[in-house]
Amino acid sequence: MATNNIVVLGAGVSGLTTAWLLSKDPSNKITVAAKHMPGDYDIEYCSPWAGANYLPVGAENSRVGQWERATWPHLRDIAQNHPEAGIHFQDTVVYNRTKDQGSTTGQWFSELVKPNPWYGKVLPNFRELSKDELPPGIDNANRFTSVCINTAVYLPWLVGQCRKNGVVFKRAVFKHVAEAANAHHSGQKADLVVNCTGLSSRKLGGVQDNTLLPARGQIVVVRNDPGLMCSISGTDDGDDEVTYMMTRAAGGGTILGGTYQKHNWDSLPDPNLAVRIMKRCIELCPSLVAPGQGIEGLDIIRHGVGLRPVREDGPRIEKELIDGVWVVHNYGHGGYGYQTSFGCATTAVEVVREALQQQKQRRDKARL
């Protein structure tokens, strides 16, 4: 059986999911090469900082919406059948204020919070809240069951799924994407490189995608459990400030957020912003603390900052010949990397097959 030597560059959720799906074909011999691996916490490495959850933000017929739809069955299956993966179901409410429509966060959440969304036919227990169930200042709200992911458990679990299929992991840093072809564990040059370097594709030689930009997210992790996952279309504190909370599976704590600050590279938590985040979360979900308590009722584990890899034209999944090396890109997933992970990885695998077939045809033609 002919083998395909493939290097996946990057070990975030996109790289690991793509490597796992590729490894299900025994003809693919895969090396994951990355500067950062699960267990690391670095501002360059976005995936560990994510909440993470499944709150669809793509329009129904958009690429993002289709990838979100394709990802849900996988996350549902893992939550149901693989508790060791760190994904669990959560009762979820998303609130909408009409006045947020023009804001940065209002635009980001527009599909999520609108009445009768496409995902209402996909996620279990969906219903729109009646007018008498709405808190003051809320124009409409959707309630449903979704999932929350403990990234500190899930990312290593993905590594384990890859390892069971023979994927080799190695730490490496490359100045140019074509150099990654020399990192295959066989010692031979890889037939193809899959670029899943996220925001680092902005400076990676051979790629240098200047349409990538950071959308800074700041969070507070607490021991309190509000009893549900909750979000709202905007805040009164700032155009790029967000309010959401989710409790991670397997004792991962509750994430309180947040921000969506484009072009902001600051890796240090802002203490004043942290106070605003905590106050907003308690206001949105009073069950977060004991009756009558404010932020003093929160038991803080840590503060965190991550940089979402936003791309102006959305995720890039396509093949390209760079310095004689076939490269398939899968990066630029913004704030929806986990909830599009399987959809995007499936598309990337299809593009890998196309590139390998094209490569084979060129070799066959050269022999004639």
Curated annotation (Swiss-Prot):
GO terms for biological process: D-amino acid catabolic process; D-amino acid metabolic process; nitrogen utilization. One of its GO terms (cellular component) is peroxisomal matrix. Partially inhibited by benzoate, crotonate, and D-malate. One of its GO terms (molecular function) is FAD binding. InterPro entries: D-amino_acid_oxidase_CS, DAO, FAD-dep_OxRdtase. (R)-lactate binds at Y244, Y260, R308. PROSITE patterns: DAO. Its main location: other. Optimum temperature is 55 degrees Celsius. It holds the Pfam family DAO. Its cofactor is FAD. Keywords: Disulfide bond, FAD, Flavoprotein, Oxidoreductase, Peroxisome. Homotetramer. This is D-amino-acid oxidase.
